[in-house]
């Protein structure tokens, strides 16, 4: 009946037709106790979650689709009169996925089925990029943050032990914290209200002994520590810029999502997370599949790369070449990836931050000749360094210094250094220095540029995540639940791409425009691809 009503099939039907399902109930045995009561099939629930994110459905809509849509029943191998399940079951199943990296295990199992089907292989070419993810919480000012944290702690205390609040909460507290905080852009007396909020938070925490504090109360304690200091009289006062503020990597931005962090990249400011997406990009492959998804706090991209390679190694899907932008690369990662995983990283190493490199004038580090055997450096004017240091504070860099009597009379000093001291040259150990020089030389090669241009295709996948599946904003609170959302979305995109490959006509290149046809008739050449590496 499903085939009769959908002759061309749907994405949901494709999973059963070509893969006979992505998971089996035996794959989920470790997730459940042996003596539990019978429940719903975890393989079917996992498939429903994937279809939910494929079609951007809510939990209620997904449960209704299982009851009403015939292609869902076909994909799940259900009878036509199957009543389905309550929508809250999906919430419970996602909670199971949050534990012990089970979301990554779900992705690994699906990729294993796809590898058995021959649509993804090891030691190919892959590419990675990242984008911002907004937390499921509104941006709060400092005053709103403290007030909302107190409200959240009061709500938790009222649920756990309401007797603790007796004698503390009065009419004024009911006025201040009885409803969600909504302040205008310029609230009246903000400093006074912030000081009052700090005093209220302190009184509340004193009423809550440590052994009776829940997660919301602990969040309030951390917010108080991050935003207040003790004054000379033992009271709390708000922190100022002179006192110093906690770093963004540890500063809590919402009492309802303790793991979200505020970050700045260029002109972009957001509160939330980062998602790193890795996909295949082999030229002979008809479809690119997502092989890894990492959801992290908004830290540097270089910190995410080792974990990506470790997970790909566990899945036996390590690439031969890994295309990355400069944010992921460092010279040490180039060396470690080749040594530990035999993966060639293709991308530009970050340029030097010295003024000579930024202004493209003067003598850069590359203009100096480094003799590692003699442990000395020769400048463009022929002078040799007299000090060779390997300070632990600058590891793994080596420091070579010249003497003032060499630099002061030199006519090229303005092009060499702008400081009052003599020139100092910092460089990496020999094996890393040679690797860095090779990478910068490769960037001038047209063939290398043409290969690296393939990396830009992953930005289309990022766009598919953000615009096609609403991954820009998290549906849930917390890093683990946000990661579950991203993994299920990635599996859904893989299924969608494979279904389009097998149910549609083969891809044909775009026909030339009228003007391009005119150029062809006149025998004039034109660039087929604007990224030619020239």
Indicate where each model-derived feature is located:
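Basic, low-complexity segments
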Residues: 1-35
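Residue-level detector of alpha-helical secondary structure
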Residues: 14-18, 47, 65
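Alpha-helical support elements that line or immediately flank enzyme active sites
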Residues: 44-56, 295
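Anion-binding and metal-coordination hotspots
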Residues: 61, 66, 82-83, 91-534
């Amino acid at each position: 009946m499903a085939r009769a009503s959908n002759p061309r099939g749907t994405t949901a039907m494709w999973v059963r037709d070509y893969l006979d399902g992505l998971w089996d109930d035996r794959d989920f045995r470790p997730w459940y106790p042996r003596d539990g009561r019978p429940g719903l099939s975890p393989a079917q629930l996992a498939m429903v979650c994937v279809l939910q994110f494929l079609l951007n459905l809510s939990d209620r809509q997904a449960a209704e689709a299982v009851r009403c849509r015939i292609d869902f029943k076909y994909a799940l191998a259900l009878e036509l009169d199957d009543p389905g399940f309550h929508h809250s079951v999906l919430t419970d199943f996602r909670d199971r996925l949050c534990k012990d990296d089970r979301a990554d295990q779900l992705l690994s199992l699906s990729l294993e089925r796809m590898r058995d089907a021959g649509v993804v292989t090891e030691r190919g070419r892959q590419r990675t990029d990242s984008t911002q993810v907004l937390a499921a919480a509104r941006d709060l000012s400092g005053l709103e943050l403290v007030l909302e944290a107190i409200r959240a702690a009061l709500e938790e205390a009222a649920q756990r032990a309401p007797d603790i609040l007796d004698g503390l909460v009065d009419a004024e507290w009911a006025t201040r914290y009885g409803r969600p905080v909504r302040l205008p852009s310029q609230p009246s007396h903000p400093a006074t209200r912030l000081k009052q909020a700090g005093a209220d938070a302190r009184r509340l925490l004193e009423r809550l002994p440590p052994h009776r504090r829940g997660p919301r109360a602990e969040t309030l304690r951390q917010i108080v520590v991050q935003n207040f200091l003790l004054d000379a009289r033992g009271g709390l006062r708000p922190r100022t810029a002179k006192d110093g503020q906690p770093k963004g990597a540890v500063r809590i931005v919402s009492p309802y999502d303790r793991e979200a962090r505020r970050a700045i990249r260029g002109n972009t400011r957001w509160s939330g997370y980062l998602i790193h997406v890795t996909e295949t990009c082999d030229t002979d492959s008809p479809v690119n599949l997502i092989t890894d998804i990492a959801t992290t706090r908004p830290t540097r991209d270089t910190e995410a790369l080792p974990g990506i390679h470790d997970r790909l190694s566990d899945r036996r899907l390590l690439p031969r070449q890994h295309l990355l932008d400069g944010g992921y690369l460092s010279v040490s990662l180039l060396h470690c990836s080749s040594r530990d995983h035999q993966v060639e990283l293709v991308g530009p190493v970050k340029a030097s931050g010295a003024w000579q490199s930024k202004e493209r004038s003067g003598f850069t580090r590359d203009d100096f000749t480094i003799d590692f055997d003699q442990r000395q450096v020769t400048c463009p004017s022929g002078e040799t360094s007299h000090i060779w240091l390997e300070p632990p504070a600058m590891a793994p860099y080596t420091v070579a210094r010249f003497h003032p009597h060499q630099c002061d009379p030199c006519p090229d000093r303005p092009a060499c250094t702008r400081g009052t001291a003599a020139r100092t040259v910092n460089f990496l150990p020999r094996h890393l220095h040679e690797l860095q020089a090779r990478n910068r030389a490769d960037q001038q090669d047209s063939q290398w540029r043409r290969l690296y241009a393939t990396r830009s295709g992953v930005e289309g996948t990022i766009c598919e995540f953000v615009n096609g599946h609403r991954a820009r904003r998290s549906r849930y609170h917390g890093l683990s639940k946000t990661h579950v959302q991203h993994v299920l979305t990635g599996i859904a995109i893989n299924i969608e791409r494979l279904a389009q490959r097998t149910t549609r006509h083969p891809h044909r290149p775009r026909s030339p425009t009228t003007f391009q046809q005119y150029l062809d008739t006149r025998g004039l050449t034109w660039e087929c691809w604007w990224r030619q590496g020239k």
